[in-house]
Amino acid sequence: MKVLRWIWLALVLAGPVSAQGYRVRLDTRVHSVDFRGVQLDSVLRSATVPDSIGGLYTPDGYAVHCEPGDTYCTFFREGPRHESAPLVATADASAWGFGVRGLSAHATARLGYDLSSDGAWPGMEPAFQLITGYMEYAVERLTARAGRQVLASRLGTTGFDGGAVTWRMPKQRIDLTGYLGWGLARGVALPVTSPALNPLDDFQPQQRQIIAGLEGAWIGRIGDARLVYQREVDPHFDKFVSERVAISGSARPMAGLTVSGGADYDIAAGWWGSADLSVMYATRNITGTLEARRYRPHFDLWTIWGAFSPVPYKSLRGTVTGRPWRRLQLHARGEVYRFDPADASTPLVEYETDGWRGELGATVDAGRGWTIDGGVTREFGPGAASTGSGGSVTYAPTRAMRVSAYASWLDRPLEFRFSESVLKMAGFDGGIDLNERVRLTAGAMRYSENRNRPDAAAFDWTQWRITAGMVVLFARGADLENLPPAIRRMPGGRNAR
């Protein structure tokens, strides 16, 4: 398995050497972060001090948690400040012109390293990650890929090492896709057996899962439809990891009107997953969307999380964007939601199962490159609520230069903890194109957070974050001539749209 992976990587990275055309986009960013840590501490239960309502505290005023029968109680106290300086470099490469029409190579790789001595920044191991790396053969009716790939569908994002084939039937407007390979862990470009995922401990699979899927798509003038089937199998136990099917589609019955929706069914678990139905109407000056949604989280059968019977929620959401004047844009968003019954007995606690959230905002084009944006948000839901506002001012005198200053405020009280978070944030960021192939970026942010609570754990969480970056484009070949600067700045080039 590792041999095949390195063969694919060598073939892809060797592409620019033998190809007639290539494109390499190198995005390097460094951050400097200063943040407060916490320390787990304990105290003898006999040394705690009760308050008037039965709560227990340490002699110096920290609220503690005591398990029945335990000699010691635990609590968190203020820890030392940490400084981290993560450096992340992402390379996106494509090569073509190997002497075979339609043959190309593609790779996206990431290198991360913490320049500080603390080593407290998460996600730095392993230092090198191959996100994608595959050879592609594409002609009018056929596209075939071999290597590390990431496919997006109604079932989410699927990463695997293997092969994928798409067959197109232009007259029928039908595309058929099939793929097979060794799966990657969800949300990360690592196999599920990687040591970086060792917190799974005894639940970590001993072998990589085998993933297979089929997808059919019809794309017409007035709409489209897709059907997806996907299964994952653990070869060590010869058991299903997941098996799901999904359908989705959209229709455009008239100019400006789009109706779309879809649903998925978890065959392995035997229940319906997520579903949604939305209606969008757009004119020159106003756009509105109304969406009904049902969401249920999906967990693979090898994990322990499925045993907790994840509860779905249903929501109704609406958004409106209007432009009453040429230089003014208004937008509003609102949503109400409700969780299904959890079928859990809580005789001593009453809790909420529904909530709502909303947002109002405006964007003003002040002219001569100036843009002003601002808005307010409000949310009330199970366990917490929030009230906030924010705004930004952007100056972009040319396409090659932009600088923004922004600030926001958020008040977040918690229902089940005697703690209220008040967060204030201010910062700036900007970028400039030195030429068509080099772009520099920089920024700084200050987060000022206080926890209002009646014990000694109400300490300050204020931190600074400073960023700097450089994007460099190396290219050769007629296919890249006359590309707009906005396309060159995209993380995935033209394919990122």
Where would I find each of the regions flagged by the language model?
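Positively charged n-region of N-terminal signal peptides that target proteins for export
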Residues: 1-5
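Bacterial N-terminal signal peptides
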Residues: 6-15
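Gram-negative and organellar
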Residues: 19-497
